[in-house]
């Protein structure tokens, strides 16, 4: 994956991400295809009418349904859904947040119950990397915890330590494994830290040290005031590599 910064205007940036499945002009609107396809529209509308250059799939949901065996047999998510342009998968971290009543977190990972049938499952950082390799998106997200915007400092501190520990394990597993379908994949670390400036800055510096091909700023729009959200985004811009997609 390659990123080219083309224009700037203050803090605003326009750039071009190049993947093996095509190019993404940033900033970009990314339609959400939770289960691999975008609901309510045909694929040709996504490609021809909306001209979506990338869509998002969800690791948690794709793992449960249709499942990894079907996805691998199809040759990955691109072949499964017929979308031959870039794709991104989130790691399931937001679902860890949203399913708080049916999950249990530890340093090892996250134990949760399926929202479909109540069956028990376990996500570890290594396991999520393997799942995302099987799904086959061009851009993979690291496994993280997304704390609520109302979390107190003690919880946010503990959550960030968990996310940082998981990131080390994600990075190791990612570099120990290869893409399954003949094209490259990139892993993006995710900056967390809730609404706390010092934690956000600590996380931005920590994640930047991995030398990844791009970065995500996560844990936003989860209950915090809009003004705080924008402050926290602005507060990490200078700490995340400017020459990369983010």
Functional labels for PLM-detected ranges:
Residues 1-180:
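Non-catalytic, usually N-terminal nucleic-acid engagement modules in DNA/RNA processing proteins
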Residues 177, 185-246:
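Glycine-rich phosphate/ribose-binding loops and adjacent secondary-structure elements
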């Amino acid at each position: 994956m390659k990123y080219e910064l083309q224009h700037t205007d203050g803090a605003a940036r326009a750039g071009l991400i190049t993947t093996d499945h095509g190019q993404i002009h940033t900033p970009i609107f990314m339609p959400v295809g939770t289960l691999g396809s975008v609901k309510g529209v045909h694929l040709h509308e996504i490609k021809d009418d909306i001209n979506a250059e990338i869509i998002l799939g969800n690791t948690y949901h794709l793992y449960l349904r249709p499942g990894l065996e079907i996805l691998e047999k199809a040759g990955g998510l691109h072949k499964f859904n017929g979308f031959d342009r870039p794709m991104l998968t989130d790691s399931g971290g937001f679902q860890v947040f949203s399913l708080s009543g049916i999950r249990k977190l530890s340093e090892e990972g996250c134990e949760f119950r399926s929202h479909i049938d109540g069956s028990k499952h376990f996500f570890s950082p290594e396991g999520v990397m393997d799942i995302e390799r099987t799904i086959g998106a061009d851009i993979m997200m690291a496994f993280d915890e997304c704390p609520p915007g109302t979390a107190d400092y003690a919880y946010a501190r503990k959550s960030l330590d968990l996310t940082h520990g998981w990131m080390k394990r994600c990075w190791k597993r990612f570099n120990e494994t290869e893409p399954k379908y003949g094209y490259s994949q990139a892993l993006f670390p995710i900056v967390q830290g809730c609404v706390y400036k010092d934690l956000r800055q600590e996380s931005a510096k920590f994640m930047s040290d991995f030398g990844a091909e791009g970065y995500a700023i996560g844990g936003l729009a989860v209950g915090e005031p809009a003004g705080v959200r924008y402050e926290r985004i602005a507060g990490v811009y200078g700490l995340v590599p400017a020459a990369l997609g983010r």
